[in-house]
Amino acid sequence: MKFFALFIQRPVATTLLSLAITLCGALSFILLPVSPLPKMDYPFISVSAYMPGASPETMASSVATPLERSLGKIAGVKEMSSNSSLGNTNITLEFELSRDINGAARDVQAAINAAESLLPSGMPSRPRYYKANLSDSPIMILTLTSTNHSVGQLYDIASTYLAQKLSQVEGVSNVSVGGGSLPAVRIELNPNALFNQGVSLNDVSQAINSANAQRPTGHVDSAQQNWQVHTNDELKNADSYRSIIVHYRNGSPVRLQDVANIKDSVENTRVAGMSGGEPAIVLVIRRESGANIIATIDRIRAELPVLRESIPANIQFNIAQERSPTIRASLQEVKQSLAIAVALVILVVFLFLRSGRATLIPAIAVPVSLIGTFTAMYLCGFSLNNLSLMALTIATGFVVDDAIVVLENISRHLEAGLKPAQAALKGVREVGFTVLAMSVSLVAVFIPLVLIDELLGRMFRDFAVTLATAIGISLLISLTLTPMMCAHLLKSSPQKSQKRIRGFSKVLLKIQQGYGRSLKWVLNHTRWVLLTLIGIVVLNVWLYINIPKTLFPQQDTGRILGFVIADENSSFQSMRDKMKHFMQVINADPTVENVEGFTESSSGFMFIALKPLKERTESIEKVIIRLKGKLSNEAGAQLYLLPIQELKLGGRGGAKSIYQFALLSDDLGELRKWEPIIRKALAKLPQLTDVNSDYENKGSEIAIIYDRDLMARLGISVNEANALLSNAFGQQSISTIYLPRNQYKVVMEVAPEYTQDASSLEKMFVINAKGERIPLSYFARWQPANAPSGVYHQGLSASSTIAFNVAENYTLSDAISAIERTMTELSVPSAVRSSFAGIAQDFQKTQSSQLWVILAAIVTVYLVLGVLYESYIHPLTILSTLPSAGVGALLALELFNTPFSLIAMVGIMLLIGIVKKNAIIMVDFALEAQKSGKLSAQEAILQASLLRFRPIMMTTLSALFGALPLVLNSGDGAELRQPLGITIVGGLVMSQLLTLYTTPVVYLFFDRLRKKWHHRRTIKSQVVKSS
C-alpha cells in the first residue's frame, strides 16, 4: 500500500524516473549495431594442407588420416569432416555451441603439432588452420575490370593493395580475391627439344634456381667510406630468363629459350572471374562477428572513392552486390509493423475507455517500456535485428496489458464516484498482484528457452530477453507511472462520449450481456464443456503430429548462390565458355540485377543478385525454377541454384543443395557400391529435387605402373621418376621474384600443346647416373582409368554426402520421412551407415527438443503460479486455457499453408504467456470475491467473468492487434514474421472464443474436487478420532 502511495504522492520523482528510463533507452538505441539476425557464431575451425601433385587418395591416406586421428581427440568436437582433392586436404571441425572458439583453436594447433611427425616430408608447408563463421554470408561484392590491364595485373592490384586496405576498415573480417592469380613467369618446356639437346627437367629447374638467387652480399669498409655490395643476381621478367644457360652440349651452351617458351603470365591459368559474363576480378567482403552490417558497409562505401583515386584511372572498381538494401528494407518493415501495432493498441484503449485522457496514459506507458528495453539490449550485447524488433512488436500488446488492467480498474472506481487519488490507490492495490502474476508468469515462459545453450537458445535468446525486459519495465511502469498519471489526469465523473463511441459501447454491452446469459447455461452443463476441453487436447496432439514441419522459414533475401558443374573430362576453356553463357542468360533475366562469379577447373559458382522485392512480382523460389528451366538442357554442364539465407547452419561446405544426407562406411568398396544405388533411389522421390552427391567417379586418370626391377638395373629411383612427372605436369613453382610490392613465382611445366593426352608421356625421359637418356616408356607402362575427384571422410570413416532440395508443395518433414522409408526399403547393409547433416540434422534434433522446451515452459509457469497463489490447483485452472490456443495456432498455420517452424514454436510459447492472462484476471477476482463476499464458487466465477469482461477483451485485442501487422505485412523479411503473427493471432482468436467458458468451468470443477477431497479427509479424521 505504501509502495503504491509513494509514487502517486511524488509525481515529479515518478516522472523523472520514467524520463531516465526513456533517455537511457534512446541513447542505447543509437549505439546498437544492426544485423539481419542475432549473433550466431558457430564454432567452426578449418584445417588445410597442401602437397602439389598428390592424388586425392594419397592426400586422404597420408595427410587427412594422421591429422584426423590427432584432431579427433579434441574435447567438444561435434563433427569432423574432410575433403581431399588433387594436392589439397581440407578438414572442417564443428564444435559444440558451448565450446570457446579461441580455446578450441589452441587445441587444434596442438593437435597439428602432434601429427606433424606422421605427415609426408614432401609437404612444402605445415598444415594451417583458420576460424570460420559459416553462418555469415558476404556483406559486399566488388569487381575490378579493365580493357587496358591484364587479369594478372588486376589481381595483383586487388590482392596486394585493395584487399589490404579494405581489411583495415572497421568491421571487416576478411576480403577474399577470386577470378585470377598473381603475375608469374611461366616456362613452358618443349619435350622434343629437351630430348634432342639431352637436357633433363631437373637440369632446367636447377639452372633457373641458380640464376635467380637473392642473397645478402655484404659491404666494403674503408677508413673514410662504406660501400654496399650489389649484384645482378635477380631476374625480374620473362625476357631476362631467356638467355639462362641450362646445359652444355658438345661445348656449346644450351639456353632456356632453346628448349622452352618463356612468357609473362600468371601463376594459375585455370581460373577465371566474370561479372555479367565479362572478365573481372571479384572481391568478396565478410564482416567481423557481431559487427554492425549497415555501419560497416557505409564505412566501406566511404573508403571506395579514396581507393579509386589510388589505382589507374582506366580500371573500373565498382560495387556489384551488397546486403544493406535488403537489411534496411526488412528492418524498416519491422519498424513499420511496430508503429502500426502501437497505434492499434492505443486505439483499442480509446474505444473501450472512451476518454482521451485515459488513452494518453497507455500512449505514454507503452513507448517508455519499449524504449527502455533498448538499454538492456545494449548491455547484453544484442543488435537491432529482425527477431529483436519482432519481440518489441509483439511486446506492444503485452506491455499495454499491464497498463490496461490498472487503468481499467481505476476507471471503474472513478465511474463509481471515488476521487482520482483514492481511485488510483485503491485500483492499483486491487490489481497489483494480478499484474505481477501476469508479468512474472509470462517472463517464466522464456526461462527454459534462455537457459538452453543449443540451437534454440542461441537463436532466440535476443528475442526472449528483449521481450522479458519489455515486460519487466512495463510491470514497473504500470505500478508507478500509470497510477500516478491516473491520479493527476483523470476525473471522477465519466467523460461525455461521441455518438459513435456510445454506439461501440452499446455493442460491447450487448456482447457482455449475451456472454453472461450463455455463461450461466454453460455453468449448469459443465460436463459437456469438460468433454469438449478433453477433445481439444486430443485435437492438439493430432494436429501437431500431422502438420507439415520445417526448421526455419526460407527467406527471400534477393540473393542466389549458383553452382555450375561440368563433366569431369571437360577442358578449362570449355568450362569457361559454359560459365560465360550461363551468366549471360541469367543476367538477361528481367528479375536479375547482376551476377558475379568465377570458375576453376571443371566447376564454377556465381553470386546472383535479384532486383528489390518491390520491383519484382515473383518470389525467389519462382525465379530459381524459371532460371533452371532455361538452362536445364545445356549439354556437358549442370546448374544448381539455391537461395542464400541470412542464417546458415552446419553441414558440409560447398554443397550444391540446401539439405544434406550423409553415407558413412569403414569399407570404401561397400560405400562406392551403395552410394549410386541410394542416390538414384532418392532422385526418384517426388518430395526431393536437385539431388546430387559429392562422390564422383567420372574423372579420368592415367595409371602408371613402374617396372621396379628394370629401374634398379638402369639406376633410376622411383623418386627420380616421380620428380620428372611432377616437374613436367605439376605446374611447379621453382623460383621466386622479389619486387618491392610483392613476390611473384616462376612456374615450370611442359607446354600445354604437348599435354593434350596420354601420348605426352612418351616424350618424357630420365637421365641416369651414366648420362643415358632413358624414355619413361622404357621402364613404365600406363593405362587410362577412372578416379574420384575427391575423397571424403566424416570422423575417421569414408563418407559421401547426398545433397537435395525440397520439391515444391512439400516440406522438409515430408522429405525426411520419404528418405527414411526409402532407406528401409533398400535394405542397405549395416556396413553403410547414414545420417542427416546440416539443416536436416538440426531439424531432427529440434523436433525432439521442441516438445521438451514447451513442456518445460508450462511446468515453469505452473511452478511460478503455484508460488504466487500458494495453491496446487489454481495454476491448473489458469493453464487450462492453453489447449484451445494451441488448436487455434495450428489450425491457422494450416489455413495459411505455413509449415510449423522454430518461429511458429516461439509463437506457441508466447501464447502460453498470453492466453493465461485472461484466466489470471478471472481467477484472481473470483478468489477475492469468495474470500470477501461470502459467495459460492459458481457465483464468484460468474461475477468475476462478467466484471472483468472489459479488461479481458481489451488485453486480448491489444495482443491480437500487436501481432496482426506481422501477419499482414508482406514486404522484405515477411517470411520470418508471418509464422509468428499467424500463430499468435490464430491462438488468440480460438482462445478468446473458448476460454471465456472453459476457464469458469474448470474453476468450478477443481473447486468441487477440492471440496470432495476435503470432505473425505474430514470423514477419515472423524473415524480415526471415534476409534
UniProtKB/Swiss-Prot annotation:
It is found in: Cell inner membrane. The chain crosses the membrane at residues 12-32, 333-353, 360-380, 387-407, 432-452, 463-483, 528-548, 851-871, 873-893, 895-915, 951-971, 982-1002. It is a multi-pass membrane protein. Keywords: Cell inner membrane, Cell membrane, Membrane, Transmembrane, Transmembrane helix, Transport. GO terms for cellular component: plasma membrane. Part of a tripartite efflux system composed of MdtA, MdtB and MdtC. MdtC forms a heteromultimer with MdtB. This is Multidrug resistance protein MdtC. It comes from Xenorhabdus bovienii (strain SS-2004) (Xenorhabdus nematophila subsp. bovienii).
